Amino acid sequence: MDIVFITDELNNFYGAYTQRNIKKLMEGGIDVTITNQKQIRDSNPLYSGFYKFYLNWMGSPEGGRIRNLFDPKGPKITVRSFLRLLNFKANHRKVLVTDQRAIVSSSNPHDPSSNHSNVAVSFYGKAMEDLIKSELGLVEKDYPNIKSFKAEALEKSDVDLRVITEGKIYDALRENISKAEKGDKINIAIFYIADRKLLNDLAEASKRGVEVNIIADLNKDAFGIEKNGSPNRPALSELVDKNPDINVRWYETHGEQFHTKLAFFDFSNEDARAVLGSANFTRRNLQNYNLETDVEMILPKDGKIYKDIKNYYERIWNNENGEYTVPIEKYYEDGII
């Protein structure tokens, strides 16, 4: 059986060491691909240009002496691996594909992430082939059995689902926001939101009479490290200050993260749509700088997935059977992003 595991360089701290779980996979005969940064656009072109010309030739060998920034008890890192980190490139996808089903998720398979809030969709059918194709583009080895995989066609489905990656996620979000009119609802649940064009699109939708609701992470915790609330708190406080009809609630975290990435478009005169997966609503995640995978679904309102998403959102918005969210005023923050 072919098993292919594709991951980001972050897991080996950009060449400073081979992470123990990755080593176990390799020893067990599983093909591991560490995503090559060269396949990803430069999100920080000034630094990346300098890095490519002056530093890249040095490589990033193992055997460092610097404390691990992500795991103080973990292996030491090198100066070269830290300099490679500063390119800020990432394979941020979270997908699983078997011959039976596929999963696209916002969740990392990571012990410290186990308490986070996330969303995922499991599906089968022809969309699995598109997902496989997008992943095989990242590996050098040829896998004829995987490449030739044909998913069983669905006899009947009440959901139209397509796999979207990188900039196509941005296009799907902006297109759905732009077509929303008075009487429609846009419900967003998000870990990071800061893209200016997207925020402006939401502001314009609100002015058209669209009900815009946003549940966002407070950006105050990251694996035991206290953060300053950026980008969400200043970005959304400014958005509401200029557009008071937009409704924002913070997900009240207690050391964990609200790691969800979901946009739910509840149109009054047509089927709803949902976009969910790995992509945060930031420039790096949406404008072809990170590798990202989402799905866009067209959802009939008598279908199970429509009801599941609607009930999920209303439950945490209204604090049904628990305390999940708080008003924006509790953590309102002046500032400009």
Q: Where in this protein do the model-derived segments appear?
A:
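Charged, low-complexity intrinsically disordered terminal segments
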Residues: 1-337
